[in-house]
Amino acid sequence: MCFSIHKLVGDVTEASQVFVSSQMFGLFSKKPEVCNVLGDSITLRLTAEQTEGKYSVAEFATPGGVGQPPHTHDWNENYVVLEGELNLNIGGHPTIIATGDSYLVKAGTVHAPTPNGDFCRYVMIGQPGGVESVFKSLKANEKELGDMNKVVEIVTQAGVKIAG
């Protein structure tokens, strides 16, 4: 599979093509942590600790009807779709990313990733690293995730701001 990666360098986005197979993602860590939270299966492929804080990599397997509410945060996220289609809902506008494509969501941008269809598998690369703290916090509090006020409290403490 070939996809483009868009990297933010200063105020300029540089694009490059990367050839990758889905098996490659298994090489990132021998026993990656999996966080099954709010309908998402999130595999933490690389953490900030493993990359000296430079970035984090998480792989999502998300069924249709599941998704994140509109939110912002202080880090960039690059989404790479491996299977299906992802709607990033940028600023409330549908933004469909197809298999093999990528999209850079800059820090502070309102977005709400949801599958565009029955299922989507994608990789999210957060820069700088540390986004995994959101997923680990949700996993650690999974018994309280039926209370959406508690979910908002948990993600807010991890640096996510729910929009609206």
For the regions a language model picked out, list residue spans one by one.
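Conserved hydrophobic/aromatic beta-strand scaffold that supports enzyme active sites
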Residues: L44, V57-E59, N78, P94, ...
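Conserved short histidine dyad/triad with adjacent acidic residue
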Residues: T43-L44, S56-T72
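A short, N-terminal "cap"/entry segment at the start of jelly-roll beta-barrel domains
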Residues: C2-K54, E142-G164
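Glycine- and acidic-residue-biased ligand/ion/polar-headgroup-sensing regions
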Residues: N76-E77, V81-L86, G91
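Ligand-binding loop in jelly-roll beta-barrel domains
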Residues: T51, N87, A107-E132
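Short acidic-glycine-tyrosine-enriched beta hairpin
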Residues: G26, G92-V110
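Short glycine/proline-enriched turns and hinge-like loops at secondary-structure junctions
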Residues: K54-Y55, T72-D74, P115-D118
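A hydrophobic, small-residue-rich beta->alpha segment in the mid-to-C-terminal subdomain
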Residues: C120-R121, F135-N141
